[in-house]
Amino acid sequence: MIYDIIIVGTGAGGATVAHELYNENLNLLILDKGSNIPLGNAVNKIKITDLNLEIEPLEDNTEYEFLKQPAELMEIVGVGGTTLVSLANACYACTSCYKNSATAQFKVHSLELFEELLDASKELKVGSLPSHMMGPATKRLVKEGEKLGYFMEPMPKFIDFSKCDNCGLCLVGCTKGAKWDATDFMEDIKSYGNPPEIVTGFTVTRVLHNEGKVEGVEGTDKNGAKTIYKSNKVVLGAGALNTPQILRNSDITQDVGEGLFTDLFITVGGFLKDIKLNKEIPMGVKSEFGPYFLSPHYSAQLVSMIRDKGFELNESDVMGIMIKIADESNGKIHSDGTITKTLTNRDLKLFEKGYKKSVELLTAMGVDPNSISSTAIRGAHPGGTASVGKVVNKNLETSIEGLYITDASVIPQAPGRPPILTITALAKRLSNNLKEELGSL
């Protein structure tokens, strides 16, 4: 059998393409190397990868706690991808927040996503967190922040607030059906009268091609058996860490795996009795500062760190603020899968600015200054490893005809903002292009 399209990956990109095309009378095959993850169990599937972060020589002697811990990169393997553990942040990645936003970057390459962003927002039920859903900790942060002159705005979320009980467990995987994730699209596909074939536990190793045209994919099934699937087109949505390896194995090497960014972040927090941030919708508001932003965020890592400083506390006694930056796109995924990256002085200065503002906000809220701690530097939004203008063109097509990419690897530089809405819009654009092309054949 020769499929019309093989879709690799079921995260925001792959699932959206599948959802857009499943009722278009096309012969689709959807592949994912992960399996179905039970509701509420997604956080246990998070994979932590070492991020070999080289730190440029510091311009001052300040010893920040977050520089003393190994940096980490977070990903998840399973149907739905990282959408399962997202905090439902639907950032539009527009220039009003950051002049080098994802949308601005795409415009340079004649890729305009305005209509697709609106369409994605409607389908994902995006809306700003309403004031009645903000918990006491978030409201207190807003109050103190505004006293200090910081503009705090509600975070756009892909949450159906009529179903949300404010449990604060978005990271675990929503069991209430309130938070959108890519499995919602996959369930729609499965319930279709004539659903496409879906194969889980299948690892694509390379794309087959002949004379510059796609012929299918090769990979291994859950039992380790090598299998070949034939198709006229292939859409890669395997994620910015996996897509480069598939491309390299498929004879596309120029600029592949280079330019990695991860939207690095830390969470700074301290002891504030019974603040109960852990029981609120996470990251309910944000304060924008161009290449970085601040948002209330509970991190379980902070509990033991604060205890180590002599404080007796429970999880409900932690107040935290996330600092997320648009880090420089200087990382690399090597052929053996190891990841290296440099934390530049520019990156560090952004963290320093955010750290100082966070400490100011925390102490204004009443956090004991002696308890203030910082998590390790982490990256949860890897991208840039197969960017538009280098590895793909404005139609998201590679040098192999019929091979497309629709994940964060095509974003050229770090937007410093959650990318799910952007990826969904990209996937909708690609889907529209494929409909037009296949409809004319």
What kind of region is each of these model predictions?
Residues 1-99, 219, 254-271:
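N-terminal glycine-rich phosphate/pyrophosphate-binding loop and immediately adjacent elements
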Residues 166, 170, 199, 205-210, ...:
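A glycine-rich dinucleotide-binding beta-alpha-beta segment and adjacent secondary-structure elements
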Residues 60-62, 67-68, 73, 82, ...:
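FAD cofactor-binding and catalytic pocket of flavoenzymes
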Residues 421-437:
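An active-site-proximal "capping" alpha-helix that borders the catalytic cofactor pocket
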Residues 20-23, 34-39, 44, 191, ...:
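Glycine-rich loop(s) and the adjacent beta-strand/alpha-helix scaffold that form part
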Residues 96, 123-128, 152-192, 337-343:
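Helix-loop-beta segment of a Rossmann-like dinucleotide-binding subdomain
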Residues 165-232:
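Helical element adjacent to the flavin cofactor pocket in flavoenzyme catalytic cores
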Residues 83-164:
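Rossmann-like flavin
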